[in-house]
Amino acid sequence: MSNKGGRVTVLTLAFVIACSLTEIGSAATVNTHALTTPKSKSQKVSETPHARRRMHRLARTRATTSTTRVHRRHRFYERFSTSSFAETTAEGDITTGEDPIVRQAAIDALGNMNGTVVAIEPTSGRVLAMVNQKLALSSGAQPCSTIKLSVALAALSEGIVDKETPVQLGRYNHMNLTSALAHSNNAYFEALGRKLGFDRISYYSHLFGLGELAGYDIPGESAGIYPDEEISTKLGGVGKMCSFGEGVSMTPLQLGALVAAISNGGTLYYLQHPTSPEDVANFQPRVKRHLEIASLLPDMADGMSGAVEYGTARSVRENFAFEPVLGKTGTCSRSGTRYGWFASYANTSVGRIVTVVFLQGGRPTYGPKAAELAGRMYRNLYDHNFFNQPATAATATAPASTLQ
């Protein structure tokens, strides 16, 4: 019994082992088949119309992006064809009737820059010095932001703003006249220009002397250009005319006469340029017209003073910090030439002097550079005790003639 039972047990065990081996073999066969890598078949890649269109759109997008970047670089790196420097600027000037101290101070300040300096006695309209007279008397140039002086006076005259009136600029920003003059904000003066309209702007611009001769019997002087109609909206319309003088051509003499009127309380003189000692001895001021701006000048003064103390003309203080100076800068470019303007007056205890610095050229030419040169000129005058000298008898006591 025991042998028979053992044989059965052995047979049973053998059967179980055989079944297990069969299952393992089957599993191994399945797994091997599953892991077998199928033979790769070469696939032919063809470009569908949809893919071609997608690639064309992508190429156009990249080309547009690249072109935009190039244009941005070209706008930022504007090319200029006019030199900022000149070997001689005073050659051919008629100087026999000018103040020698003022003239030398202007020559030293201008240096080799391509420009002109005009100095005016605001209480008489006498031109004390005019360096590079050919340029000063030429057809003029775009006034850039110095046009803001006449626009501000027009807006004050019409009661549209005073120095504290906030003007909305965009959705969240606003600015008053003092800050707009000090920082030369274009958007502010565009808004004023649109509010005033071309007809009123044109009226006041001509009233303040634009578009007409500023001098009396000065040979070779140009009257500049003030358009009879508003420039096209494509060029910015009256807004651009009022923010940086688009479409306008102003001469240094015209700007000097206007700043002299601001300085003296509202008398717009004919500018006179004596050419001999006899002309100086017999000098008689000539009034062009009286401007009703005396009550407006305190509102102008804060902005013009702010330009020098903390605004666009603060470079004046690099060279001259001894006397109050009020002024306005201007920077713009046209046809490969960049312009830099600074019109100002030094307000001293013994009198005032108006200076206009006008530069033309390339990248080194801009309004703050003109302001720097004006500061240098004021310092030269200060070093030669000019601001300690009272007005000359010929100009201090001479009655103002109203001859036209």
Spans of features found by a protein language model:
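Short, charged, low-complexity patches
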Residues: L255, Y366-Y378
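Beta-lactam-recognizing serine transpeptidase/beta-lactamase-like catalytic domain environment
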Residues: D93, N114-A129, S139, E158-L359, ...
